[in-house]
Structure formats: structure tokens, C-alpha cells
Amino acid sequence: LKNYTNYKVVYKLTQKLASKDHEVDAKKAKVKVNQWVRLHDHNISQKVKVIIEHFKKNVMGLLGGQAKAMVVTSSRKEAVRYKLAFDKYVTEQGYQSIQAMVAFSGEVEFNDSDPNSSALVGQKFTEHNMNPNLKGREMRKAFDSDDYQVMLVANKFQTGFDQPKLCA
């Protein structure tokens, strides 16, 4: 029989698991699971694909090709992941006319408990090192130029940001 487990094995496994069963706070567990899902590479790469393709198809041609978009993320770690996935996707697709900048405060560091973070652990991410094309310019001015079409933000520029080219 395929995929067969006898009662004796099931009983032993159940006994081992029951002895290690610990109660957790349901709210904390939900927060952790949601954080894991939001930061997972596959989830972010799929969202980035939709964002870029939507921008390319529906937004990019507005305002005589000058249209801009802003993507608001729920955390600084998420903003870093979106920027990395965004850059990877546009490179893979050969899209040279779509570039993103990322805006967040301070430094972002990943740890071993973050999903798919092994390649990111030990690195410090800042606006400066994630936006090499700023070339000393202030972010608002750089975003107004032709160098950037999409701004990925976390806890920044969400209110009071006046960019007339912002269409999406």
C-alpha cells in the first residue's frame, strides 16, 4: 500500500507531539504568520510582477510618458524586499525604462527568523545604498526626473507628498 501508516506509528507520533504541545497567544501567532507571508520571496515576486506589468500596460504612457507610481509597503523590511525583487524582475525582462527607488528611514537588517533571509543576513540596507542612481540628489527631486518611475515606500512620503506626475 502506498502512503500507508499503521496505527502503532500514528499512536507513537501522537504521543510525542502531545507532550510538546504548547499554547501560544493567537494574536501573536497571527501576526507572525502574516509577517512571514508578507516577507516571503515568492509572494513578493508575484506582487512585483503584477505591479510592473500593470504600470507598463496602464500607467506608463499617461502624462506623455511622464507618469509616476507609488507603492506603499507595510514595513521597511518589506520595502527592501520589494526593491530587490523589482530590480531583479526588470533586469530579467529587459525593461530599461522602468526604475524604482525605495524610501524608508534608518537602516534595515534581516535576521535568521525572517523568511528566505539567508542571503540578506549581515547586510545593512539604507536608502543611500539601495538607490545608487540618486547621485547626491534629494529623493523628491530624483523622483521628479526621468531616472525613476516608481517609488516603493515604508513609513515615508505617504502624506503631504506633492508629486503632480503621480498617477498610480
Residue ranges and their predicted role:
Residues 43-54, 135-139, 152-156:
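Well-ordered alpha-helical segments embedded in enzymatic catalytic cores
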